[in-house]
Amino acid sequence: MFLDFMSEVEGILKEGLDRCGLSVPLENSLDLSPHADLSTTIAFRLSPVLRKDPKDVAAEIYNSMGSPSRWVDRAELVGPYINFYMSRNFLDNVVTKAQGEDAWWGRRSGSVVVEHTSANPDGPLHVGHIRNSVIGDTIVRILRRAGYNVEAQYYVNDMGRQTAMVVWGCDHLDLDDSKPDHAIARVYIAAHKIMNEKPELSAEVDELMRRYESRDPEIVKKFQRAARYAISGIERTLHRMNIHHDSYKWESEFVWDGSVDEILEMLERTGRTVLKDGALQLDLSEEGFEKSLVLRRADGTTLYTTRDLAYHKWKAENYERVVEVLGADHKLISAQLRTALRMLGIGEPEVVIFEFVSLPDGSMSTRRGKFISADELLDEVEKQAYLEVTKRRPEMDEEFRRDVAGKVAVGAVRYDIVRVSADKATTFDWKTALDFEKLSAPFIQYSHARACSIINKAGELDEFDPGLLRDDYEIALIKKIAEFDLVIERAARELKPHQLATYARELAERFNLFYRYDPVLDAKPVELRNARLGLVRASRNALSATLDTLGIDAPESM
């Protein structure tokens, strides 16, 4: 929708540039403006090159442009800016197109793998993990919405020391009958405590790691049974949050199929590896890193970083775009890995680094045994959501209230996490996240439910004339609906899911302003009533597509 308007503006602008004898790429030269539907600042970019005042440059381009056509009503010269405005035909087309399904899917193509969550199989997810999961899953949904063929992937760290500690714990301690990931965590924490009290036992964990890497059949069964058991519990939490992975890749795959050996040989051929105390290391001092990257321990076992390089090589060979979501504590190692990949001529991943999310009560740690799990957080938010739904809809039965509370709780958690730019730390506060009146997920969900209610009360919608929608609230809402594909396109390109969260809030705001000031069911004459019903249906579809892309349920009644 909006991209069609932008494409026509680009054509008009390019015609003006060509007539002026100017060849300049139009990327990032057009943007939304409070004073117009689109505005270009291209004159500022050309001014120093042409050694002319930006106003004069803009005037030359403006005077050389062709006439507006299908989607562009007019262009205006305002100082150094050229502003563009949507035509009535375009606005009518938005409302008409938004009645169907095709409007909400992009035209991109190509394969993308997005690796996210990838928590160690040693316990349940905590709030820090789920910021990774929510950001990652929302990126997956945005890329799919843009048209890409996307695979969501979980990388299982089955060869790490934490997993070996779990295996040792399962050999020496009993698993309780709680949710699998929680049961594994209790064994892990108890094993960690024993190791602290009896450090000599750590040699047994080292031996487990060595035997697993050498593919000892008995040990392989133990490791994979423990890891799969933990992941089965983690999956239940993720599914509760509408998060699903398409595939799981295990670290061990890349050791056993020779990929890690191949990476080590490639790195040694660079002439940049050194042996230090028996360990093979990659010297990255020329690239500005003080510490070398350890590739293989003195005992011959590989490290997470080496296996990760093999995994990245596999991804680069099998997908056109490679995206991974990592916590801020991975910044250094991620930079080192990307440097190593560059040295080998392997395509680098697009990395989304997120800062941490916390609760008002403090941080969480699996090793110390003091953490607030994602399950506990979701249970508490759902309990509070149930109280709010009961207060608002006491006449509804228990099943309805429980169902809505579950959808509202997950929406509240997901939205509150994703609304903040990934590079900013945030604190989750359920009171703010569950506020139905403020700009939160429940506010957006309620806007969708309100649109559904209006449509249900109206019954069958006859044909309508979108040209009757002419007041400020109607036009503002139509323009916001049109922006959906632009927001998806930019968020997919820049991997910034918070942009879609912002759009969802603005769309709900525009819809509620329209609803407040423009009667729908009581509108007269009937032609205007039908036109506004058409706009309500377009709004419902836009809200539904937006919430779906955010991984948030869109209840028809709240």
UniProtKB/Swiss-Prot annotation:
- The main location class comes to cytoplasm
Top enzyme class, one word, equals ligase
One GO term of the biological process aspect: arginyl-tRNA aminoacylation
Leader sequence residues: none
Q: Where is this motif: 'HIGH' region?
A: 119-129
Q: Can you tell which superkingdom this protein's organism belongs to? A: Archaea
Q: Which InterPro entries match?
A: Arg-tRNA-ligase (IPR001278), Arg-tRNA-synth_N (IPR005148), Arg-tRNA-synth_N_sf (IPR036695), ArgRS_core (IPR035684), DALR_anticod-bd (IPR008909), Rossmann-like_a/b/a_fold (IPR014729), tRNAsynth_Ia_anticodon-bd (IPR009080)
Q: Where in the cell is it found?
A: Cytoplasm
Q: In Gene Ontology terms, what is one molecular function of this protein?
A: arginine-tRNA ligase activity
Q: Which GO terms describe its cellular component?
A: cytoplasm
The record's EC number reads 6.1.1.19
Annotated catalysed reactions: tRNA(Arg) + L-arginine + ATP = L-arginyl-tRNA(Arg) + AMP + diphosphate
- Which keywords are on file for this protein? Aminoacyl-tRNA synthetase, ATP-binding, Cytoplasm, Ligase, Nucleotide-binding, Protein biosynthesis
Under SMART domains, the record lists: Arg_tRNA_synt_N, DALR_1
What PANTHER family does the record point to?
A: ARGININE--TRNA LIGASE, CYTOPLASMIC, ARGINYL-TRNA SYNTHETASE
Name of the protein in its database record: Arginine--tRNA ligase
Q: Which organism is it from?
A: Methanothrix thermoacetophila (strain DSM 6194 / JCM 14653 / NBRC 101360 / PT) (Methanosaeta thermophila)
